């Protein structure tokens, strides 16, 4: 791993939070269901490059992403997984004390408060057929920073699933966590984004095997398994990238209005990006179209009528791993809330992730 990568690790954490902050706009834009209205307000501010985030707060997404990162940091090198899971549970529970004005999701709030990290298996919660939301996906990217090596794929699968189902014990929820982490690892390894979707489809059977052998609510998980897989397959076919080689095909026109409609179509309940399958999907769609343009990424993933801060948090992280801070106006992140913590997390995860350490299973 080269010297430039440490800056990209830092950018991954910082720009994830910048995306969150911009997409959230102190709650004003996350819950505004009209992308065209958001883009008009954005234009009145002088567009993305004119925004100074000094008075803008991060949402629950960044608070929970930091919780994941800081648990991974505390676990150190070569942790055993049950110990790591207890630390994740502790950080998720404790971060609920910093949710005032950050619009935390119901499943995250309710379930994190019930985690009991001091008890054996106190990080487990029962299966719930209503926990397919994006709360697991929005906080898992840094797992891919910590375990980026192909030899660590099994660990990445296990940690992303178990961290996800601490609040979202439903495949649509925790497989979103897997997608967020896996695509981050792909970005670290310089894998072309058009290959990522195919990679996810190849990893899903391994995820299913893990959930089956973990022996916890297996029947219920398998009954609800197919939705995530089918939705992703449908999306990859639509963009023409199921083969992992072809260039993605976008409809014309595909402006703000058309994207809003598309995000509704891929959603579970009509709010694009609010579930575990479509939050990473919308982030991925934006990344494929944006190339190295932070502004184009923002216009597609941060500013739309769906769950914009969650798609922004995920997309900002992946883009940061790939491009660092290249072409990003410093006003978008210089006065970011918790910037120091985010930078420290990026550096610490680089230090841990650059060693191909062995992880001890349960």
From Swiss-Prot:
Domain of life: Eukaryota
GO cellular component: extracellular space
Needed co-factor(s): Mg(2+)
Keywords, in A-Z order: Hydrolase, Magnesium, Metal-binding
Family: Belongs to the ADP-ribosylglycohydrolase family.
Name of the protein in question: ADP-ribosylhydrolase ARH1
First-tier enzyme category under EC: hydrolase
GO biological process: protein de-ADP-ribosylation; protein modification process
Activity regulation remarks: Its activity is synergistically stimulated by magnesium and dithiothreitol (DTT) in vitro.
Residue spans crossing the bilayer: none
EC number: 3.2.2.19
Its biological purpose: Specifically acts as an arginine mono-ADP-ribosylhydrolase by mediating the removal of mono-ADP-ribose attached to arginine residues on proteins.
Binding site for substrate: 90, 129, 135
The organism of origin for this protein: Rattus norvegicus (Rat)
GO molecular function: ADP-ribosylarginine hydrolase activity; magnesium ion binding; potassium ion binding
Co-factor binding details: Binds 2 magnesium ions per subunit.
Listed Gene3D superfamilies: ADP-ribosylation/Crystallin J1 (1.10.4080.10)
Binding positions for Mg(2+) 2 per the UniProt entry: 307, 309-310
UniProt region (Substrate), positions on chain: 106-108, 168-170, 268-270, 274-275
Subunit structure: Monomer.
PANTHER family: ADP-RIBOSYLGLYCOHYDROLASE, ADP-RIBOSYLHYDROLASE ARH1
């Amino acid at each position: 791993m080269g010297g430039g990568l440490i800056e990209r690790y830092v950018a991954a954490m910082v720009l994830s939070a910048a995306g969150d902050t911009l997409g959230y706009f102190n709650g004003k834009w996350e819950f505004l269901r009209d992308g065209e209205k958001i883009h008009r307000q954005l234009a009145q501010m002088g567009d993305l490059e004119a925004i100074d985030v000094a008075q803008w707060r991060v949402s629950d997404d960044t608070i929970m992403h930091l919780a994941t990162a800081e648990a991974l940091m505390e676990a150190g090198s070569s942790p055993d997984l049950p110990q790591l899971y207890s630390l994740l549970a502790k950080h998720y529970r404790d971060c609920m004390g910093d949710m005032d004005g950050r619009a935390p999701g119901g499943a995250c709030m309710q379930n994190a408060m019930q985690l009991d990290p001091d008890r054996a298996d106190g990080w487990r919660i029962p299966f719930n057929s209503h926990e397919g939301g994006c709360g697991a996906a929005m906080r898992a990217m840094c797992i891919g920073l910590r375990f980026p090596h192909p030899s660590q794929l099994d660990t990445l699968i296990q940690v992303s699933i178990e961290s996800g189902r601490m609040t979202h014990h439903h495949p649509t929820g925790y497989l979103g966590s897997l997608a967020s982490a896996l695509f981050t690892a792909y970005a670290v390894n310089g894998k072309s984004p058009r290959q990522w979707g195919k990679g996810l489809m190849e990893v899903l059977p391994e995820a299913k095997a893990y959930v089956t052998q973990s022996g916890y609510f297996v029947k219920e998980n398998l009954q609800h398994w197919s939705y995530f897989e089918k939705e992703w397959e449908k999306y990859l076919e639509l963009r023409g990238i199921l083969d992992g080689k072809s260039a993605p095909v976008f409809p014309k026109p595909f402006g703000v209005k058309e994207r809003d409609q598309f995000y509704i179509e891929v959603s579970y309940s009509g709010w694009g990006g609010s579930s575990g399958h479509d939050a990473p999907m919308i982030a991925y769609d934006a990344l494929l179209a944006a190339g190295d343009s932070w502004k184009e990424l923002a216009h597609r993933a941060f500013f739309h009528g769906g769950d914009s801060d969650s798609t922004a948090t995920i997309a900002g992280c992946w883009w940061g791993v790939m491009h660092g801070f290249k072409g990003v106006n410093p006003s978008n992140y210089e006065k970011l809330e918790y910037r120091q913590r985010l930078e420290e997390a990026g550096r610490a995860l680089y230090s841990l992730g650059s060693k191909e350490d062995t992880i001890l299973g349960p």
